[in-house]
Amino acid sequence: MELGGKCNAITTTTMISTEVKPHTDPEPEAKPESDPSMALFPIKKENQKPKTRVDQGAKYRECQKNHAASTGGHVVDGCCEFMAGGEEGTLGALKCAACNCHRSFHRKEVYGHRNSKQDHQLMITPAFYSSNSSYKPRVMHPTGEIGRRTSSSSEDMKKILSHRNQNVDGKSLMMMMMRKKKRVRTKINEEQKEKMKEFAERLGWRMQKKDEEEIDKFCRMVNLRRQVFKVWMHNNKQAMKRNNSNISE
């Protein structure tokens, strides 16, 4: 009996010692879940400033706006460089304080980023086409050639701008300007010529200060202006003298 009890005790002890506890790994630390929208729209840092056009070293040179495009001509205002009309970031900064044109009309020049294709690029000025006009657009280089090729005076520019809203083409506008510059000629009949000839011979073909009253009276009688008589006498002085000398011979 004692032997059997010892065996049972040994068996029980062996079973307890052979039990192996399962090995458990420590639980991993929970990582915060990342929002997929954060990858698509990254948040900019406060001290990170976006690069503007001014930071890139861009300058806007002469104004290339054509003020006579509607009439088929080409007139620029002569503004040589863009000057902002307000502080950076405002709407006034996009308008030139000198010519009041938008910044996009000025030639852009970026230092260190000059495009080699720009030298060969051609710019066609906008033209006004009509059925009666055979005007063809001019081809120009955008590298400061406008100021040399278009030497328009301020008076011509004002005349062209005054006809911008009217339905006239370039040919009609040029005819109008030529008509204004043409001198009006006074028509003189034969009777007036004979009277002027007699009076000029009496004066000796010279207008002297002592004869001013008599000259004014004569001009009122023949219904001609004093300047007309003066010009006629100057133009016919030599011819009349030659005729008189030929007759005497």
From Swiss-Prot:
Keyword field contains Cell cycle: no
Basic and acidic residues: bias regions: 20-34, 43-54
Residue ranges of DNA binding: 181-244
Gene3D superfamilies: Homeodomain-like
UniProt site (Required for DNA-binding): 233
ZnF ZF-HD dimerization-type span: 60-109
Gene Ontology cellular-component terms listed: nucleus
Pfam families (alphabetical): ZF-HD_dimer (PF04770)
The organism's place on the tree of life at top rank: Eukaryota
Name of the protein: Zinc-finger homeodomain protein 7
Source organism per UniProt: Arabidopsis thaliana (Mouse-ear cress)
